[in-house]
Regions:
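Charged catalytic carboxylate motif
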Residues: 18, 123, 214
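Conserved GNAT acetyl-CoA-binding A-motif
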Residues: 104-117
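A conserved beta-turn-beta hairpin within the catalytic core of GNAT-like acetyltransferases
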Residues: 68-78, 88, 110, 186-191
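A conserved beta-strand-loop-helix scaffold within acyl/acetyltransferase catalytic domains
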Residues: 5-85, 230-235, 245-247
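Short, structured patches in soluble enzyme cores that scaffold and shape functional sites
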Residues: 82, 116, 165-167
């Protein structure tokens, strides 16, 4: 049964404090790495915003948007999106992102950017196929190597892809309207990733380290050739990012 979720901005201090608590529950981060209430307050007063998903009075999830620039224009940096575990099968993450888009467009902003882990297929599919974001930048070890994080005892680098959400692209407009978007051309290249990254990290850490290096190398080569990732192939065995020539992108 679908929950009756209300999407609205978080403005009160107790609401922002609940965003900090959701970070504790959702992200495998040390306490010192959590964004505190004052970070949310400063962001809001600097022109950013926090959108929350409410199940009655209970905050089920949130998305934090920080003022930024992209391609020489005003943008928002989507610093984090968190949804409590018991609400993660209700499409709340998507509701938050589409509300974020609406809010940005109301502010006259056409771009939102954020980072995500290139090794996680579920996130990649959501970002590129459900939201219509593109990727054209890879940052090795973006946050540094943190051996203290719960799922990173082997010392994996914090590699990240930068997602660019062009809020009025033909693909994003179609997806926002609930329509299916079909690419007109064939991808120039594909970069395969593993179907279950966390299982590989636990069962074969050495292989996980080598896979991360391979994926990094392939993305750096593809972006160096001017390719842009704007699709993702879901496959139980061989999921893959789909990369196209830059001039095929519909901004």
């Amino acid at each position: 049964m679908e929950k009756a979720i209300e999407i609205r901005e978080c403005t009160a201090l107790d609401e922002l404090a609940e965003c900090v608590q959701i970070q504790r529950e959702v992200f495998a981060l040390p306490e010192a790495e959590l964004s505190p209430v004052r970070h949310f307050v400063v962001t809001k007063n600097a022109g950013g915003f926090v959108i929350g998903a409410y199940d009655g009075d209970r905050l089920a999830g949130f998305v934090l948007s920080v003022p930024a620039f992209l391609r020489g224009e005003r943008a928002f940096y989507s610093h984090m999106t968190g949804v409590r575990q018991e609400y993660q099968s209700y499409g709340i993450g998507a509701k938050l992102k589409w509300a974020q888009r609406t809010r940005a467009l109301d502010d006259g902003v056409k771009y939102i950017k954020w980072t995500f882990e290139p090794v996680k297929a579920k996130n990649a599919y959501f970002n590129l196929e459900k939201l219509g974001a593109i990727v054209c930048e890879y940052q090795p070890n973006f946050y540094g190597t943190d051996y203290a994080t719960a799922d990173n005892k082997i010392g994996l680098a914090s590699d990240r892809l930068f997602a660019e959400w062009h809020l009025e692209s033909s693909k994003v407009n179609a997806l926002a309207a609930g329509e299916k978007y079909i690419e007109t051309g064939e991808p120039t290249a594909a970069i395969e990733i593993m179907s279950d990254w966390l299982s590989m990290v636990k069962s074969n850490p050495a292989e996980a380290l080598e896979e991360q290096k391979r994926i990094r190398s392939e993305f750096e080569a593809a972006f160096g050739d001017g390719l842009i990732g704007r699709g993702f192939r879901r496959d139980a065995e061989r999921p893959a990012f789909l990369l196209y020539q830059n001039n095929d992108v519909h901004f």
